[in-house]
Amino acid sequence: MLEVKPLQSAAASQGLLPLEVRDLALEVGGRRLIDGVDLALHDRGLTIIMGPNGAGKSMLLRLMHGLVPPTKGVILWAGTPMSASIRRRQAMVFQRPVLFRRTAIGNITHALWLRGMSGDERRSRAVEALRRAGLEHHALAPARVLSGGEQQRLCLARALSLDPDVLFLDEPTASLDPASTLAIERLLVDTKRRGTKVIMVTHDVGQARRLADDVIFLDRGRLTEFQSASRFFSQPESLAGRAFIAGELIV
């Protein structure tokens, strides 16, 4: 049986996240959705995954988080293949809010209960997570009565209450109004500053410019660029990347 090593490793102490993607591929129904992706990420900062429609952005994110098994290749955390134990050190927020039929604070304490935390710790973590998300005044409100933006912030607060090493987000602001989007962006900046690695899919070039430290750019399932955000937006190397930034590709 393969021994799962802790995420805090020599690679992490040297500024490298223990995430390596090697020759990753996913084929579904004879169609190659992800095609030979290789990359390694730093353990800090915010990485944006971008690309046109059908590029494989969300699928790559799900592969990284271990929600979908690859057809080929390997995903390593601290040199160890993805496992349930490793995935418990991560959290993910999807485009549409997924919430329990509970109050706002109940959504968080229930998630922490599932992780086996004590009552006092659940309560303190939930209160702090709601405060960070600006939802402390809605703690006892049923999640269903919150606005779309508030529900998404609650999903993010619940994820952050788990104190993950890595936070994955799949277009978390795609259907939100500007004010809700700004609130979530501020929360993500705060999350990054606190040392959590953030990996996010977005089709919004403006949002990527505001948030990204580095950019993964996909085109038809292939990695065409992986570089710092400043370089990607000033000197994109691929034709698809240049067209995307210029707004010439459908996103």
Say what each PLM segment does.
Residues 142-146, 150:
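Conserved ABC ATPase signature
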Residues 120-138:
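Conserved ABC ATPase "signature" region
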Residues 202-203:
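H-loop/switch region of ABC-family ATPase nucleotide-binding domains
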Residues 178-180:
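Helix N-cap at the start of a conserved alpha-helix in ABC-type nucleotide-binding domains
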Residues 167-170:
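Catalytic Walker B motif of ABC-type/P-loop ATPase nucleotide-binding domains
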Residues 208-210:
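A short, surface-exposed alpha-helical micro-motif characterized by mixed small hydrophobic
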Residues 65:
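Helix-to-loop junction immediately C-terminal to a conserved catalytic motif
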